[in-house]
Amino acid sequence: MDIKLKDFEGPLDLLLHLVSQYKVDIYEVPIVEVIEQYLNYIETLQVMKLEVAGDYMLMASQLMLIKSRRLLPKVVEHIEEEDLEQDLLEKIEEYSRFKAVSQALAKQHDQRAKWYSKPKQELIFEDAILQEDKTVMDLFLAFSNIMAAKRAVLKTNHTVIERDDYKIEDMMASIKQRLEKENVISLSAIFEECQTLNEVISIFLASLELIKLHVVFVEQLSNFGAIILRKEKK
């Protein structure tokens, strides 16, 4: 199964995306929640056999250190722990400013380019806004949290993960048939019935394809909330 998803520009870009979902000041975000979502994303990439760059793994190890210290009993205040968190948040804030300036310059460049050259035509599905202002990466991040829970269930149940091959076309047909009966379904409900991680991954990719083709419509009522598939647009 060949899978290609557009990546973030780096670990700080991913962290900024996660932090921005909370709609609060960077220094007010629940840092442990953000760390868990980052780690879920990395683990899901690995399960799906997608390449993970070294800088993402380095950041993951640093975040795991912060998380582990956060979860330890607070017998003595750890100055080093506070420094690690403060340093991380300052880096995210600095990257946020850098990205804003970079985007402003890129916009100016695009405006000038219209007068001097034919604009380059590009079609990147992986970075496209699908529906309800949701991008593929928004759905993938929500999916990675679901995958983390599913992996925990399979591990607890001592489930043997077999190398089953699931055709995306078959999964697309299955989702469409289910929507014919129920009109609205949540991806979490479908995933609960899956027996292997390969099946979960195939269903997710089938859902993305159906959304892209506007065969089904996607809805997420809140950040990090359940992913809902609808037969018809609201």
Curated annotation (Swiss-Prot):
Keyword field contains Zinc-finger: no
GO biological process, alphabetically ordered: cell division; chromosome segregation; DNA replication
A Pfam family it matches: SMC_ScpA
A cellular component annotation (GO) from this entry: cytoplasm
InterPro entries, per database record: ScpA
Gene3D superfamilies from the UniProt entry: 6.10.250.2410
Keywords: Cell cycle, Cell division, Chromosome partition, Cytoplasm
Subcellular location: Cytoplasm
HAMAP family (UniProt xref): ScpA
Subunit details: Component of a cohesin-like complex composed of ScpA, ScpB and the Smc homodimer, in which ScpA and ScpB bind to the head domain of Smc. The presence of the three proteins is required for the association of the complex with DNA.
Cited function: Participates in chromosomal partition during cell division. May act via the formation of a condensin-like complex containing Smc and ScpB that pull DNA away from mid-cell into both cell halves.
Sequence similarity: Belongs to the ScpA family.
Protein name, entry field: Segregation and condensation protein A
UniProt source species: Streptococcus pyogenes serotype M49 (strain NZ131)
